[in-house]
Amino acid sequence: MTQAHLTVVDHPLVQHKLTLMRDKTTSTAGFRRLLREISLLLAYEVTRELEMTTIRIDTPLCEMEAPTLEGKKLALISILRAGNGLMDGILELIPAARVGFIGLYRDPETLQPVQYYSKVPKELDARMTIVVDPMLATGNSSVAAIDLLKAAGARNLRFLCLLASPEGVERMREAHPDVPIVTAALDERLDEHGYIVPGLGDAGDRMFGTK
């Protein structure tokens, strides 16, 4: 399903793996493996508009002009800590991508993001920049991360997540209407604690085995 600003990847493999990730009986090892696998599938959609060029190669039969990615034009930015799980799968496909990290945590009282770390690649103005975080809940952390990246020069941005809430999508649309969102599912709502419902719990805790 594709709407303005939002693409929900409803491929059967994506939805099957997401169901396994939602199941509370899935182990930490299983959750981690599924996150890597689903990130490989989501990478296909979020990188759809990567810039291409052509090079001349020799096949076993003849010379030809063949399409290839244009240089090192991709930057991946993980919102720590759970974003790392989504990033790993994309790096398997595009190992030359530049990588950055933004550390944000959500204040449990205000639900507002608090930044504690930032290290991003140079020349973001020349790269497609994909921000990865499994959950787009309130949208506050995502908006803060994109604010930081735009201040650092990023202009061609995408946001990739596993689950999104209607509230988070609307928050992103209001703050950054130029940033497309790619997700595996648009869930029903947020609860009173700012968690996505039905959701899958805390993605970071389930990936790292912490509480």
Curated annotation (Swiss-Prot):
Free-text remark on how the cofactor is bound: Binds 1 Mg(2+) ion per subunit. The magnesium is bound as Mg-PRPP.
Biological processes annotated in GO: UMP salvage; uracil salvage
Taxonomy, superkingdom: Bacteria
Protein name (Swiss-Prot/TrEMBL): Uracil phosphoribosyltransferase
Designated gene of the protein: upp
Cofactor: Mg(2+)
Disulphide linkage map: none
Record GO terms (molecular function): GTP binding; magnesium ion binding; uracil phosphoribosyltransferase activity
UniProt-listed InterPro entries: PRibTrfase_dom, PRTase-like, Upp_B, UPRTase/APRTase, Ura_phspho_trans
Taxonomic source organism: Paracoccus denitrificans (strain Pd 1222)
Amino-acid positions noted as binding 5-phospho-alpha-D-ribose 1-diphosphate in the UniProt annotation, renumbered to this chain: R81, R106, D133, P134, M135, L136, A137, T138, G139, N140, S141, D202
SUPFAM superfamilies reported for this sequence: PRTase-like
CDD domains: PRTases_typeI
Keywords attached to this entry: Allosteric enzyme, Glycosyltransferase, GTP-binding, Magnesium, Nucleotide-binding, Transferase
Family: Belongs to the UPRTase family.
EC number of the protein: 2.4.2.9
Binding site residues for uracil: I196, G201, D202, A203
Modulation of this protein's activity: Allosterically activated by GTP.
Catalytic activities: UMP + diphosphate = 5-phospho-alpha-D-ribose 1-diphosphate + uracil
Pathway: Pyrimidine metabolism; UMP biosynthesis via salvage pathway; UMP from uracil: step 1/1
Function: Catalyzes the conversion of uracil and 5-phospho-alpha-D-ribose 1-diphosphate (PRPP) to UMP and diphosphate.
